[in-house]
């Protein structure tokens, strides 16, 4: 992965090429005059060269993000609420208590082994199984071809929304069972009305609750991705001991044609979620909202301090035209390191022994450069975005935020 400080330099260069008022959000006050000088010297040559360089920088950033090309999301693309909630929990924007009312539980175990979460909606035109038996059954096909070859899937879950049943005198005491199967053979190769399947997960649920149900479908998804076995989809079966066939399955949102209507179908349709790791960086670890510590130094004192320290640098994705496919965050505080490393180096400058020796030699021999002010600690950010295939991705990117600076 490209180091974080190189990424920040690329973003800064992109802003120089774009010009205009966008510098206010990305370049600190001390650098604006230099940017203006660069633009002035460039003159007429800037027009043609800037677009070519911008394409190169954009390609570098997209490669760092693991994308083959710049996403061009369609107007029909839907961001599942589940993925938005996962982002807010994982990034620390909201605590679990604030979002618990939605019924979402953070998937600690799957996320602990993954740095990428992807969501997939099913192909609607393949959902009906002809000639099914007495129970309500549907087949779903999920296209997982957008998962990169280098991403190893560790687990997968199928999320189904079910609504409270209030039909009949005994509905409060009623239960129904939801069975999830992997389809082992396509319908065309078997006797009509029968599918060759294997059971993946099952659950007995109560009628009088409206909520999302999560089922483990990892064995099927691992066969499709790791073992490269054919993907014939999943079958969902809903049964009830005391319910007629007419009403079976109507409380589980697995079809657009339900009596409840299709206005909110986009957010309530079945969702397949995969957890994977591309071998780069750490897994999705939840970040708690940091408490701000009181500032002990006045702004005037900070301006006088020219020693190595961290400075503010806000990266706004709208400045590079990426806000159409990056869902969250709209930008982030990247910070940068700048300042002197004077002799003698103070303890708070977080110096190495080599930097101390180099600074000592510089004090008597100016041909030896001073130690440099560089990032000594970097942290990750989480990004929620639409990829090239209109699939929603939550990914952890390492070395994106400067946490500490020092003389090295």
UniProtKB/Swiss-Prot annotation:
Entry-linked Pfam families: TGF_beta (PF00019), TGFb_propeptide (PF00688)
Gene Ontology molecular function terms on file: BMP receptor binding; chemoattractant activity; co-receptor binding; cytokine activity; growth factor activity; heparin binding; protein serine/threonine kinase activator activity
Principal cellular location given in the protein's record: secreted
Keyword field: Chondrogenesis, Cleavage on pair of basic residues, Cytokine, Developmental protein, Differentiation, Disease variant, Disulfide bond, Extracellular matrix, Glycoprotein, Growth factor, Microphthalmia, Osteogenesis, Phosphoprotein, Secreted, Signal
SS bond list: 308-373, 337-405, 341-407
InterPro entries linked to this entry: BMP4_TGF_beta-like, Cystine-knot_cytokine, TGF-b_C, TGF-b_propeptide, TGF-beta-rel, TGFb_CS
Outcome of substituting residue 150 to K: In a renal hypodysplasia patient
Glycosylation sites: 143, 208, 350, 365
The keyword Chloroplast appears for this protein: no
Subunit structure: Homodimer; disulfide-linked. Interacts with GREM2. Part of a complex consisting of TWSG1 and CHRD. Interacts with the serine proteases, HTRA1 and HTRA3; the interaction with either inhibits BMP4-mediated signaling. The HTRA protease activity is required for this inhibition. Interacts with SOSTDC1. Interacts with FBN1 (via N-terminal domain) and FBN2. Interacts with type I receptor BMPR1A. Interacts with type II receptor BMPR2. Interacts with FSTL1; this interaction inhibits the activation of the BMP4/Smad1/5/8 signaling pathway. Interacts with SCUBE3. Interacts with TGFBR3.
Disorder this protein is connected to according to its UniProt record: Microphthalmia, syndromic, 6: A disease characterized by microphthalmia/anophthalmia associated with facial, genital, skeletal, neurologic and endocrine anomalies. Microphthalmia is a disorder of eye formation, ranging from small size of a single eye to complete bilateral absence of ocular tissues (anophthalmia). In many cases, microphthalmia/anophthalmia occurs in association with syndromes that include non-ocular abnormalities. Non-syndromic orofacial cleft 11: A birth defect consisting of cleft lips with or without cleft palate. Cleft lips are associated with cleft palate in two-third of cases. A cleft lip can occur on one or both sides and range in severity from a simple notch in the upper lip to a complete opening in the lip extending into the floor of the nostril and involving the upper gum.
Protein name (Swiss-Prot/TrEMBL): Bone morphogenetic protein 4
UniProt organism field: Homo sapiens
Protein encoded by which gene: BMP4
């Amino acid at each position: 992965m490209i180091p974080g400080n190189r990424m920040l330099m690329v973003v800064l260069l992109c802003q120089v090429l774009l010009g205009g008022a966008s510098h206010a959000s990305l370049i600190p006050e001390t650098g604006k005059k230099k940017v203006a000088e660069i633009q002035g010297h460039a003159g007429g040559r800037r027009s043609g060269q800037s677009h070519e360089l911008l394409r190169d920088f954009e390609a570098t950033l997209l490669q760092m993000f693991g994308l083959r090309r710049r996403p061009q999301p369609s107007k029909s693309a839907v961001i599942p609420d589940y993925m938005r909630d996962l982002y807010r929990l994982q990034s620390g924007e909201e605590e679990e208590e604030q979002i618990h009312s939605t019924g979402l539980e953070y998937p600690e175990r799957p996320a602990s082994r993954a740095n990428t979460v992807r969501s997939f909606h099913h192909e609607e035109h393949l959902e009906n199984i002809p000639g099914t038996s007495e129970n309500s059954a549907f087949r779903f096909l999920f296209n997982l071809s957008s998962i990169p070859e280098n991403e190893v899937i560790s687990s997968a879950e199928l999320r189904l929304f079910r609504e409270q049943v209030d039909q009949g005198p005994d509905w409060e005491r009623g239960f129904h069972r939801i069975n999830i199967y992997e389809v082992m053979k396509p319908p065309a190769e078997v006797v009509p009305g029968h599918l060759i399947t294997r059971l993946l997960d099952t659950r007995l649920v109560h009628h009088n609750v409206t909520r999302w149900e999560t089922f483990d479908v990892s064995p099927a998804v691992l066969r499709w991705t790791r073992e490269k076995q054919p993907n014939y989809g999943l079958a969902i079966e809903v049964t009830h001991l005391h319910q007629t066939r007419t009403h079976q399955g109507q409380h589980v949102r697995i079809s657009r044609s339900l009596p409840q209507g299709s206005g909110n179908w986009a957010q309530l349709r079945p969702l397949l979620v995969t957890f994977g790791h591309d071998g780069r960086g750490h897994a999705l670890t939840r970040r708690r909202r940091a408490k701000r510590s009181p500032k002990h130094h006045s702004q005037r004192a900070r301006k006088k301090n020219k020693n190595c320290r961290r400075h503010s640098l806000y990266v706004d994705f709208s400045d590079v035209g990426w806000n159409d496919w990056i869902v969250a965050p709209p930008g982030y505080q990247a910070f940068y390191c700048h300042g002197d490393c004077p002799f003698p180096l103070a303890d708070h400058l977080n110096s190495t022994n080599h930097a101390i020796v180099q600074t000592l030699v510089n004090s008597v021999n100016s041909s030896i450069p001073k130690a440099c002010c560089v990032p000594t600690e970097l942290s990750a950010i989480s990004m929620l975005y639409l990829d090239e295939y209109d699939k929603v991705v939550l990914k952890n990117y390492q070395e994106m935020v400067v946490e500490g600076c020092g003389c090295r």
